[in-house]
Amino acid sequence: MKIVAPVMPRNVEEAQSIDVSKYQDVNLIEWRADFLPKEDIVSVAPAIFEKFAGREIIFTLRTSREGGHITLSDQEYVDLIKEINAIYNPDYIDFEYFSHKAVFHEMLDFPNLVLSYHNFDETPENLMEAFSEMTKLAPRVVKIAVMPQSEQDVLDLMNYTRGFKTLNPEQEFATMSMGKLGRLSRLAGDVVGSSWTFVSLDQASAPGQVSLADMKRILHVLESED
């Protein structure tokens, strides 16, 4: 299971002062560009990609529709993603599928998509349908993060992940049940077929994230042969 950690600078000075040594035990860097004003994202990008040269980067523009910090029209959203991709070609690009389905056709030629769905309010009853629709599109990664209201919600998310991974072994999934209640799903991803787990360093980017230090200890125990 790969460990993903966010970088969330709010200006170019913060981007330039990122301590990359904190990320040495991380497999993937997620640049949460939505912590910046829209007009600053392209100008801050060089600092991010230079800081993490040689590392795998996920470009994420989490909008207010899915718990993020920026409000964009569908066209603004896809245009900004395409601009960053054209210049920097990040290893992965997060695309909020259900929130921006109207412009998804503009992303069909992109081989590095993380199709994502986030629900910070609940674990919806149609979660299985969301899994199915996104999996059929065969992106690099299907990412689903939902908020549980019960233990059963957590188990449902994990069971759906296991089921869809079994039926689609070549498809990568990154799924999590958020908040304290859902923390188990972040720790047991390998068991159910979730390839990524998101951790926090100085600041969490989503509820229920485990710190990098704790995650390393837990994974060491889970992956130990003894």
UniProtKB/Swiss-Prot annotation:
3-dehydroquinate binds at E30, W31, R32, R62, R186, S205, Q209. It catalyses: 3-dehydroquinate = 3-dehydroshikimate + H2O. It comes from the Bacteria. Keywords: Amino-acid biosynthesis, Aromatic amino acid biosynthesis, Lyase, Schiff base. The active site is at H118, K143. One of its GO terms (biological process) is chorismate biosynthetic process. Pathway: Metabolic intermediate biosynthesis; chorismate biosynthesis; chorismate from D-erythrose 4-phosphate and phosphoenolpyruvate: step 3/7. The keyword Amino-acid biosynthesis applies. Its EC number is 4.2.1.10. One of its GO terms (molecular function) is 3-dehydroquinate dehydratase activity. NCBIfam families: aroD. Belongs to the type-I 3-dehydroquinase family. Homodimer. Involved in the third step of the chorismate pathway, which leads to the biosynthesis of aromatic amino acids. Catalyzes the cis-dehydration of 3-dehydroquinate (DHQ) and introduces the first double bond of the aromatic ring to yield 3-dehydroshikimate. This is 3-dehydroquinate dehydratase. It comes from Streptococcus equi subsp. zooepidemicus (strain MGCS10565). The gene is aroD.
